[in-house]
Amino acid sequence: MRYRLFVRLNCHLCADAFALLCEMGVEVQRINIDRDPALRAQYDVLVPVLFDAERDRELLYPFDAEDVRRFMAQG
């Protein structure tokens, strides 16, 4: 899957970000950073983070629908 959302359990901002992406129709895989020590070290206080695996880019929270659209449109 192209887009990944780095999250952690019981994170209300992560839930908000996922809900926004779902409302926009963005197919995204949620990845719990607490299951991977390397991801936890990289994203510990940054979650939620939207990651584009094809372009190796990140969109840090806070973001809104317009930010996501711009992020997805950038080449």
What are these regions (language model features)?
Residues M1-M24:
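Local sequence-structure signature of Cys/Sec-based thiol-disulfide redox active-site neighborhoods
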Residues F6, I31, L60:
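Small/polar loops that bind or transfer phosphate-bearing groups
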Residues D16-A19, A41-Q42, F63:
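Generic recognition of short, well-ordered alpha-helical segments
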Residues V26-P37, D44:
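Thiol-based oxidoreductase modules, predominantly thioredoxin-like and allied folds used
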Residues E54-G75:
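Non-catalytic, surface beta->alpha helical segment in thiol-disulfide oxidoreductase systems
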